[in-house]
Amino acid sequence: FREFGLDWDWNVDLYGKLLAVTGGKERIRYYVESFNTDYVKPDNFDELVASLHKTKTRHYTEMLSGGRIPVRPGVRRLLDEARKAGLRLAIATTTTPDNVTALLKYSLAEDAESWFEIIAAGDIVPAKKPAPDIYFWTLEKMNLSPADCIAFEDSENGLKSSLAAGIQTLITTNDYTADHEFPGAIAILSDLGEPGNA
């Protein structure tokens, strides 16, 4: 925010509250409307939001490429096992394609995008999670029934989205969601585990 001359401060507690809104640009708008109501929006507010989000993505990518954001326990192992078993993989997310690309490249492997048959990201559908649209789009593109799939989510909005699409869902919590309840999830785990690491 400092790069844009803004005195906004998203501390850990506030960011946890902002995560109730999916989508980075939507989250910025929500912050202004709900937590910074004295802020006078400039005429180019939509452009400002897009620029803020693009800058955030640049910083995020720099952190990933520098190894400062590790992949969560068990993710790499599970993906490797799924690929060896010939399972079809997809990503259905509200984040931008650039964020997904950076996360896969720097956290998993240079060619990790190719592991997934479909990567549905960002504004590919008009309604973001908790709406099920991103899952419906992915199911249609893969010609799959929800009953043939399992979703992995880490938020209440993600769970609502996948369940509304009819997909059984496993939750892995994070620092922001560890104390949340996830009604309807088939399992709630702190992580996906690494055999041999207790």
Regions found by a protein language model. Give the residues of each.
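A structural preference for short, pocket-lining loop segments at secondary-structure junctions
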Residues: L87-L89, T93
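Glycine-centered flexibility sites
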Residues: V21-G24, G74, G86, G122, ...
